[in-house]
Amino acid sequence: MLKDIQSPAKYLQGPDAAVLFGQYAKNLAESFFVIADDFVMKLAGEKVVNGLQSHDIRCHAERFNGECSHAEINRLMAILQKQGCRGVVGIGGGKTLDTAKAIGYYQKLPVVVIPTIASTDAPTSALSVIYTEAGEFEEYLIYPKNPDMVVMDTAIIAKAPVRLLVSGMGDALSTWFEAKACYDARATSMAGGQSTEAALSLARLCYDTLLAEGEKARLAAQAGVVTEALERIIEANTYLSGIGFESSGLAAAHAIHNGFTILEECHHLYHGEKVAFGTLAQLVLQNSPMDEIETVLGFCQRVGLPVTLAQMGVKEGIDEKIAAVAKATCAEGETIHNMPFAVTPESVHAAILTADLLGQQWLAR
């Protein structure tokens, strides 16, 4: 099997990047179809439109209705065709960006994504999650290439709720450990090949950046200001983690996250919050050294990520519920089977309960 690495064609980051990106966007198309929900359009829409128009790029802005569904994609594509735009810009959170990617794919147009939060590593990826109109998961759309441009305006992201940035750190926390597991197992990555040394190195840099800058970045976000630490964490959450996961692979941490989604008491948690606990469970599952586990526990406590089942909202009927989570985690096709050893529901059940006790012990110190 070939080794494979993929990434966006261009990644831009910095204060006011949502305005300054126009100088690069003009190389992609002479007109853009801009989508965002009402809140984001008021927050950043004017910035983006001005950034395009200042470089003589025509644009048409349209409201996104909030659901990345085939019906919404088709509705927006019809408007795009009527307007004759030759590129797509999505501004906002995951569903808006996924919709922009889908429109670009179906219309064979360049795509620019402008996240307003740094809560996951999804913006750089070559996939969209499609839902029904009722908001239920329908399918993944896998694209032949990543977005043409990812634009991270750190001045906008600094004003977002701190918990979203911390959730992004939780998602990014898993990247190194899952990438290394996939590398050791010679597993097939999301990119369709085996991991390169470059992708593995980016995953490691992601982890090292979290440990060095995470707490400082959280405080900057709390103050709503841009610092060098915040810049580095935004890059880690988005680019380093994005390339690391897509070109190396996912393993136990994300599968355990998926298992926890069956519990109603975990529905209030953000993606990265569940992934962070899944990372602790993966470390137990693979019998990582205690000093490594304690490093991760300390990081999670400092930035505000859950390290116990109680913090996840699971407080009653624990044994039975975790047995169900473990069974879901090990479903056929789940990424936990990328681990470099055989995994069973029983071993996952044991790892989760042990991770919980390790978290309790750490908090009681």
Language-model segments: which ranges?
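C-terminal charged capping/lid subdomain of soluble metabolic enzymes
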Residues: S288-R365
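Short glycine/serine/threonine-rich phosphate/pyrophosphate-binding segments
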Residues: M41-G45, K95-A102, T120-T124, G249, ...
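A glycine/threonine-rich phosphate-anchoring loop and its flanking beta-alpha core
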Residues: Y105-A198
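Active-site segments that bind and position negatively charged phosphate/pyrophosphate groups
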Residues: M190-L305
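ATP/NTP phosphate-donor binding region
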Residues: M1-G87, L309
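A short, small-residue-rich loop immediately preceding and capping a beta-strand
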Residues: L80-I117
